[in-house]
A protein has these predicted regions:
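Sequence/structural signature of beta-propeller domains
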Residues: 1-244
Length: 244
């Protein structure tokens, strides 16, 4: 178990926000420790971005590099939706490591703050399909599971754009509140038709014949200098792609 105050990694994405300020995204949360293999050891860790400052000072010690870099965390902003999100119930997915039932994938802060937080837990998806296909797809913007990767700041500095591996998704969030402003419709061939809490099952050709490769979604995100166009980069070719 990790304390809620544990910062963890911030290396999924880094975006310049002016001056000495940067926006950093951590991954979907801790899953390196055995927790529950039926949800890929993911937890209800709330997706977020960090605001940090990076200060350079001259190194006068006479050894080492010419400058010292001092990072300072100034804010952590949790990502949420004003509309209802799909969370897993935990039914049929076994127990937590302490033997208690896995339970809902909804973060407990949802009730406290009367909102709907995005989370890294892998079963946080629903059956409703926003694309109108016969089956649910991973592009459903109502799914709560969100694995932040690339990040860019809008030209006016008021919002951030974050790409993800689960959908893949590209969402726009208010930089102050963390509430989602918009979910962009991406090409349909990037999504998978059948979602599972276990990534290895999702990736079986018997389950999905096309779409993003598990854990290799929209890893990178760029924005043009005029701020009008986002450029997303997939970590790997989509499944069964004819070229690599």
């Amino acid at each position: 178990m990790l304390p809620v105050t544990f910062l963890g990694g911030i290396g999924s994405g880094l975006a310049y926000a002016g001056g000495n300020t940067f926006i950093a995204t951590p991954d979907r949360g801790p899953n390196a420790t055995a927790y529950n293999a039926l949800v890929d050891d993911t937890s209800s860790y709330i997706s977020r971005f960090h605001t940090i400052t990076l200060d350079l000072t001259a190194n006068t010690s006479g050894t080492g590099l010419a400058y010292n870099l001092m990072p300072t965390l100034t804010a952590t902003t949790l990502l949420s939706s004003a509309t209802t999100l799909n969370y897993g119930t935990g039914a049929g997915l076994g127990n937590q490591i302490d033997g208690t039932p896995l339970g809902s994938g909804a973060p407990t802060l949802n009730l406290t703050n009367s909102t709907n937080y995005f989370s890294g837990r892998s079963d946080n998806f629903g059956t409703a399909n926003a694309l109108g296909a016969p089956n649910s797809t991973s592009a459903n913007p109502s799914n709560a599971r969100f694995d932040p990767e690339g990040v860019r700041v809008s030209n006016d500095g008021k919002s951030v754009f974050i790409s993800d591996e689960y959908g893949p998704y590209v969402n726009q969030f208010d930089r102050t509140t963390g509430e989602r402003i918009k979910s962009f419709a991406l090409p349909a061939n990037l999504a998978i038709a059948h979602e599972f809490a276990v990534g290895a099952t999702e990736q079986l050709a018997t389950q999905n014949t096309s779409g993003r490769v598990t854990n290799k979604g929209m890893e990178g995100l760029a924005i043009t200098p005029d701020g009008t166009t986002l450029v997303g980069m997939m970590q790997a070719p989509v499944a069964r792609s004819p070229t690599s």
